[in-house]
Swiss-Prot record:
The name this protein goes by in its record: UPF0690 protein C1orf52 homolog
Keywords: Phosphoprotein
Coiled-coil region: none
Record-listed Phosphothreonine modification sites: 65
InterPro entries tied to this protein: DUF4660 (IPR029089)
Amino acid composition bias (Acidic residues), ranges on this chain: 149-160
Modified residues annotated as Phosphotyrosine in this record: 130
Protein's UniProt keywords contain Phosphoprotein: yes
Biased composition (Basic and acidic residues): 48-61, 161-180
Location of region: Disordered: 1-66, 96-180
Top-level taxon of origin: Eukaryota
């Protein structure tokens, strides 16, 4: 049983051996193929093939420790500061005011205070309530002009859309009939 147990690192020992020879065979012929591959460099027939093969992982890591461009012979340490590449500095951006019709910022914004509407003259208001439009009643400048007696406005059916009004003479007898 101990002879059948494999060394876990034996897989890497046969680095570079062709897998086509041992694809259908069991583990014992693979070991035999590995031994042949290990002794092949000494024989003259397989010497050319050994030169073309890459070195095994152990040999490779023994020979290469650091890349030459990282090595600083004075300090014998990697000089990382020499290899740092800094991004170019961007100039500070200047603040430009956008031209728009938006509301200005709060510092410069002041609300325009509208004056209160003019107060209604109470004499005119009470005069209108009690229909006391005598000679001594105050006159409102905004009030419409009254028609002289004997005239009234009449709207015709044809001109309802235009709201045009016509003035006609009313006889004193007709005015009394319409009021009743």
């Amino acid at each position: 049983m101990a002879a059948e147990e494999k060394d876990p690192l034996s897989y890497f020992a046969a680095y570079g051996s062709s897998s086509s020879d041992s694809s259908d065979e069991n583990s014992e012929p693979e070991d035999a193929g590995r031994k042949e591959a290990a002794s092949a460099p000494t024989t003259g027939g397989r010497g050319k093939q050994a030169e073309k093969r890459l070195p095994g992982p152990d040999e490779l890591f023994r020979s290469v420790t650091r890349p030459a461009f990282l090595y600083n012979p004075l300090n014998k340490q990697i000089d990382w500061e020499r290899h740092v590449v800094k991004a170019p500095e961007e100039p500070p951006k200047e603040f430009k005011i956008w031209k728009s019709n938006c509301v200005p910022p709060p510092e410069t914004y002041t609300t325009e205070k509208k004056p209160p509407p003019p107060e209604l003259d109470m004499a005119i208001k009470w005069s209108n309530i009690y229909e006391d439009n005598g000679d001594d009643a105050p006159q409102n400048a905004k009030k419409a002009r009254l028609l002289p007696e004997g005239e009234e406005t009449v709207e015709s059916d044809d001109d309802k859309d235009e709201r045009a009004s016509k003035i006609r003479r009313v006889e004193p007898g007709e005015a009394a009939k319409k009021k009743k």
